[in-house]
Amino acid sequence: CLKNIHDLLGMSFYVPAYQRGYRWGAGQVKALLDDIWDFTLNKSTTFYCLQPIVVTRGNNSWLVVDGQQRLTTIFLILKFLEHDHLRRPLVEAYQVSLYQLDYETRPECTDYLLSLSEEQSSENIDYFYLFGAYQAIKEWFSDKNYNENNKFLDTLLAKSNTENAVKVIWYDLSDECADNDYAIDVFSRLNIGKIPLTNAELVRALFLQKSNFKHHDTRLKQIQIAHEWDVIEQRLQEPAFWHFITNTSKKYATRIEYIFDLMKGKKETYEAFY
């Protein structure tokens, strides 16, 4: 079905262990803003539709199978407009709060989304991308006046189905998703062939399949492995340590992939990384 962005307000979303962090760059963020702004000005169609948000029902939240990047970017746009345009909490203007994003293995990211501190942005790769996206949003809005900001926000958060609204394709897998393995399989299939996912991130998803663990310790082991994976990645992102262990000229979006290349005996190529 289709949902207005306004319909997502007040919801709680949970990003499971098999997913990597936020990785959109400034170009992708600004392209989304341009598209929404173009729709705001022209409104040649009844609604502007984002790519699917794929979810399953959790206990008190929606588990995100696919669409984390889009959900996070919209969150950051609304966070900026709340702070710099409305200058008051969204709940005061719209009687409902901004939706919440929680992470199974990176709970500190939930707090960082509230502060978006420049000082902390170099602490890990997730903060780096989140802060970069927020700065791109600030830059994009820098030449917009109050009325233009208001138009943009009114379009983004249009309430009724009769208004020109921004919508997402909402795909609820709850009835089909008997276990975590099915969600991981869907996640992998949806992302094969997409630029954002690296080989290492697909390997991570496969490692965390429920069938790899005994039933009594499945969740504990999944969380432990996902946490250790993130710790390794953060260590590899430290410039001094990275240059100590490698002299490769190849650029890795996720540096743990270098370890897999070593294990496989993969020779370096000079193809550009995209």
Where are these regions (language model features)?
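Covalent nucleotidyltransferase
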Residues: 1-274
